[in-house]
């Protein structure tokens, strides 16, 4: 739904289907290879032309890291419920990672046990629709999630029953991503701040925003922080509101680009 709305507004919308699944870009601490995967994708799809970087959660963090690494690729940066982790909280994450205790406090404690196989797409839909977090999603978004987020399962437990599906995004890779959350964002932003305008969309009930806080994010985006009703997954809960908010920001960014040849670096306090 989001992509359709943005394309209908005249934008060319592209995205990497699954981060972390390409052997050339493994998941490691602080996600340098995932950042490079995004940069390679941008440079291949839009050579020499900066783009609007829009990302939710993981996508927002990687977009920020990409904009810091190679400022020339970013026309603007819009982070969707990807609160910037710095200071003592970032140091705590670093220590927990080093001690191999991060799984006790990160979402990986759930993802490592996540169900990943079903006898049919209908069974997968019923499974997620019954879960509280997914029940809040717009029905059409959940349908898209099943259609695009699952794939035929060649290792279905019941070989006599065709139609089995599994999660397309492997749970062990999702778990590894959670366990390698970047703890160096503050250092990256201090040394190589984005040279493009930056904005942030936050969920009013986002646990992630509440846990991380918004001090570093506000220092990065200044007045360009907007709230949308919902949890961390508000783009799936309120897709129309999210799509409209993104389009407003992109229009604002385009106007800024036309009026000024280059934006000053956005440096956190």
Regions found by a protein language model. Give the residues of each.
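Gly/Ala-rich beta-loop-alpha elbow adjacent to hydrolase catalytic centers
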Residues: 55-59, 63
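Flexible "cap/lid" loop of the alpha/beta hydrolase fold
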Residues: 68, 75-117, 210
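Catalytic histidine-centered segment of alpha/beta-hydrolase-like enzymes
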Residues: 230-243
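Active-site loop/oxyanion-hole signature of alpha/beta-hydrolase fold enzymes
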Residues: 14-54, 68, 84, 93-96, ...
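Short, surface-exposed "cap/lid" segments of acyl-processing enzymes
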Residues: 1-11, 15
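Aromatic pocket-lining residues of Rossmann-like dinucleotide-binding sites
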Residues: 6, 66-70
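Conserved loop-alpha-helix segment in the C-terminal half of the alpha/beta-hydrolase fold
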Residues: 189-230
């Amino acid at each position: 739904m989001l992509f359709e709305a943005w394309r209908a507004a005249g934008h060319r919308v592209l995205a990497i289907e699954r981060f972390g699944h390409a052997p050339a870009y493994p998941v490691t601490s602080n996600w340098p290879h995932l950042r490079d995967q995004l940069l390679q994708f941008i440079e291949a799809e839009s050579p020499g032309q900066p783009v609007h970087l829009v990302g939710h959660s993981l996508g927002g963090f990687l977009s920020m890291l990409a904009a810091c690494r190679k400022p020339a690729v970013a026309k603007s940066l819009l982070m969707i419920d990807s609160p910037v982790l710095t200071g003592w909280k970032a140091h705590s994450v670093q220590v927990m990672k080093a001690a191999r205790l991060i799984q006790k406090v990160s979402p990986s404690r759930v993802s490592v046990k996540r169900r990943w196989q079903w006898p049919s797409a209908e069974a997968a839909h019923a499974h997620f629709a019954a879960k509280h977090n997914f029940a809040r999603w717009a029905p059409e978004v959940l349908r898209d999630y099943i259609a695009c987020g699952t794939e035929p399962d060649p290792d279905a437990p019941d070989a006599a029953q065709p139609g089995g599906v599994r999660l397309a995004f492997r749970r062990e890779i999702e778990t590894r991503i959670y366990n390698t959350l970047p703890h160096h964002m503050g250092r990256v932003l201090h040394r190589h701040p984005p040279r493009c305008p930056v904005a942030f969309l936050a969920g009013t009930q986002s646990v992630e925003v509440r846990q991380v806080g918004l001090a570093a994010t506000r220092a990065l985006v200044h007045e360009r922080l907007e709230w949308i009703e919902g949890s961390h997954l508000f783009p799936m809960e309120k897709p129309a509101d999210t799509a409209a908010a993104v389009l407003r920001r992109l229009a604002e960014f385009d106007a800024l680009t036309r009026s000024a040849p280059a934006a000053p670096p956005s440096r956190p306090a």
